[in-house]
């Protein structure tokens, strides 16, 4: 039996294949009860928020059942609330007690950014279907409300139209600027220096994710990120640094979202009971430092702080998870390829070489 780690992607899983993958899962008869619970939980969340908040943060609504049965509106997944809900629903569907969640080869879980909550669900390993469905509902409510509160807290991260137009003249891909941007090819030392000089002017750009030795992500207001880009444009060009705005509408892993993490605590009575770390049946690893969450004090606090506020140190997290749990196989639970790609690059730098396979491959073998 190969010691197996379940790996969950973050909002990088919001790609062209997410909708088709979610629609395929929804069409399977064995997932009927699960999706019934998903739709009911989302209806409860929307009722809880009220019409004014719904219109503010979800202008297209979130009728997931109708979208899966007929079609998603254009750009629906550009809203990070919608994207995060879809990513989480996709990931947790694979953890039902009759499927991979019950496989004894699985000995640990690790989630990139918002994928942490799916990793926690995997680690709790409910054995009965009713327990799983109750956990899935509370987990989806936690994720959805965290995204809503994050969106509300980030209300001031809009962009200066002149800076946006100036940037789009340079970006051949035409990706709309937002509150997170990825840099590839710049050393951490040089990036810290550039950020320090920029932030001394009273602006606020923060390093939110160190995904691999070559890929880092910044968070801040869209205007600040654009201004930072133009302040360093010549250096980026000379050093062949690639800059790319992410499709996120929320600046994850930054101090901008500290108020959101606090606000979700006020929503917990609605969210319902969430098991504590003593209920984890296997290691679930943190992403801010080499830690096993079985030794934490509160899984909700861990999710809120690690996803909304604290930066990710993926190389340290991935290396610790693989070594600590003696992992021989990593199962990529998707829905996107980002977590797998970053993990492979980080482990290559550390000399580790576990086998990687997709959740679909693992699923076929488990039947």
Language model segments and positions:
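Short beta-strand segments
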Residues: 7-9, 113, 184, 208-210, ...
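Gly/Ser/Thr-rich loops at beta-strand to alpha-helix junctions
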Residues: 12-13, 114-117, 222, 250-253, ...
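Surface-exposed, active-site-proximal loop segments in enzymatic domains
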Residues: 73, 118, 122-125
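Acyltransferase/transacylase module recognition
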Residues: 1-106, 266-269, 273-367
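Gly/Ala-rich beta-loop-alpha elbow adjacent to hydrolase catalytic centers
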Residues: 91, 107-115, 119
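Short, function-defining helix-loop hinge/capping sites that tune catalysis or transport
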Residues: 18, 121-123, 261, 342
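Alpha/beta catalytic cores of group-transfer enzymes, especially the acyltransferase/condensing modules
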Residues: 123-298
